A protein has these predicted regions:
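Activation/maturation switch segments at domain boundaries
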Residues: 412-459
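Extended, charged amphipathic alpha-helical segments
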Residues: 189-346, 382
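Short coil/turn segments at secondary-structure boundaries
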Residues: 89, 103-105, 251-260, 330-335, ...
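Extended, non-catalytic structural segments that build the interaction scaffolds
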Residues: 23-42, 288-323, 339-362, 392-426
Length: 459
């Protein structure tokens, strides 16, 4: 729940660059992601699609991802701590529209704070959307009190300012978005060493990095904030949940039962019917018998309309996949869909493109983070070397997610046959080995490599 923006703006004497539509959208995405959408009630259940979509994209983006800072052991240690939890936080970014990596000095070292989009408020930004001033929120619950820390960053004319404020309020009042009363930072042990104000001269960029989901913001096209990966599918997800609930109702409503007269069963000493143990759900008893005074026994087993209902749900899921940039079959069943080779390829390419765009945005954010880490380390006189991002930082993504490997290998094989590519490069790519190992795998000249170097290879 985002705190009252007006209270924060008044307290810090600033203007928050977020309108009500954007604030409401972020709150909606957060509620959908936590399986608590506003349409949830006794009759409408949720499939958990927002979480599944964010999780799958985060998995595809970060699978087998490796990155390191080669010339700074101290910074790299902190950086690897972030890399180890990057998939989880990429999922949060996908769900909520973005996250902030915010390095800070603590106990003689550089640490990284990760701020999700519902705890982050932009204040000012450049014409290209780079955020230069922002408010970060952190909350702590202590017994019946809620403590909120506001951290304000401003980058202006190569001067950088960081201010910290702390507030407390009673946590027993539901839906209270107020800040409460201002208190000292040492009210919370984790905050007692924080400085109330820091001023840095000759700063080159903000001391935080914003990982923004690379999609157009249809909520507020002027906002620097990113949107959820399922922002274009909120209505479809609602309809899918309703259709899913109809299926659950259909299964429950057509559940096998036996309508019987109470006279079928004997009673215990307290007058309760003695229904066979474990069969209470099967028998539905009624206090009647037919006109001929016979004990009624009527099985209830109506036909189920599951095929039509599931087909309807599947259509919603395919539309959601399209809007979220996922390949068909990620959420939906594809057996009942006749697709041409061109349509299947286009579907996969859509997913590849989505993942690649998010990877690029994440890599750019990590580069900015590393620069900020080095700048803060120098400010606090921590001995670190200058970092050349292109030379000293490596990013290794799993290309098999982005590239159609079979097509790529076939193209390489054709190049080898045409004599414009060395065979060991093809083998290295196909089997994931070095060029030296690939050369050892190849038959010796004069044995089987008489004409085509690929004649002996199995396809």
């Amino acid at each position: 729940m985002i705190l009252n923006r007006q209270d924060i703006a008044k307290e810090l004497e600033i203007k928050i660059a977020m309108n009500n539509d954007m604030a409401n959208a972020i709150e909606l995405w957060c509620n959908m992601y936590s399986n608590n959408p506003p349409w949830l009630d006794d009759e409408t259940k949720t499939m958990g699609l927002p979480g599944a979509i964010a999780n799958e994209l985060a998995r595809l983006v970060t699978i087998e991802f490796k990155s390191e800072i080669s010339n700074n052991e101290l910074l790299n240690k902190t950086y690897q701590d972030l890399i180890s939890v990057l998939r989880i936080n990429t999922e949060y970014a996908c769900a909520k529209g973005g996250i902030v990596f915010k390095p800070y000095f603590y106990n003689g070292n550089i640490e990284i704070d990760i701020v999700q989009q519902d705890n982050f408020l932009p204040v000012s930004y450049t014409s290209t959307g780079e955020i230069t001033a922002a408010v970060f929120l952190e909350t702590k619950i202590v017994e019946d009190k809620k403590y909120t820390r506001i951290e304000y960053h401003e980058f202006k004319d190569e001067n950088y300012t960081i201010k910290n404020y702390a507030y407390v309020k009673n946590n027993t009042i539901m839906m209270d978005k107020s800040l409460g009363k201002r208190v000292n930072l040492n009210s919370i042990q984790e905050w007692e060493d924080l400085e109330e104000e820091i001023n840095v001269k000759n700063a080159k960029k903000p001391f935080f990095s914003y990982f923004k989901i690379p999609q157009a913001n249809q909520i507020d096209s002027n906002s620097p904030l990113g949107v959820s990966v399922f922002a274009k599918s909120t209505g479809l997800i609602k309809e899918a949940d309703k259709q899913y609930s109809r299926i659950l109702w259909e299964f429950e409503g057509t559940e096998l039962a036996i309508d019987v007269s109470e006279a079928i069963f004997s009673r215990d000493s307290e007058g309760n019917l003695k229904i066979p143990k474990g069969k209470e759900r099967l028998f539905r008893t009624y206090p009647w018998e037919d006109k001929e005074n016979k004990k009624n026994f009527n099985p209830f087993s109506p036909s189920i309309r599951d095929v039509n209902l599931f087909n309807g749900l599947n259509k919603f899921l395919r539309k959601i996949e399209f809007n979220c940039g996922l390949a068909y079959g990620t959420l939906s069943e594809t057996e009942d869909v006749s697709k041409t080779a061109t349509e299947i390829k286009a579907s996969k390419q859509r997913s590849f493109s989505t993942v690649k765009d998010i990877q690029k945005a994440l890599q750019d954010a990590l580069k900015d983070l590393i620069i900020s880490m080095a700048d803060i380390a120098k400010y606090y006189n921590i001995p670190v070397k200058d970092i050349d991002i292109d030379k000293d930082v490596s990013f290794d993504w799993d290309d098999s997610i982005i590239v159609d490997k079979d097509t790529d290998l076939e193209s390489m094989r054709n190049d080898v046959v045409a004599g414009i590519l060395r065979a060991e490069l093809y083998l290295a790519k196909k089997y994931g080995v070095s060029e030296e190992e690939a050369l050892k795998m190849m038959p010796k000249l004069g044995d089987s490599l008489k004409n085509n170097p690929l004649d002996s290879l199995e396809e």
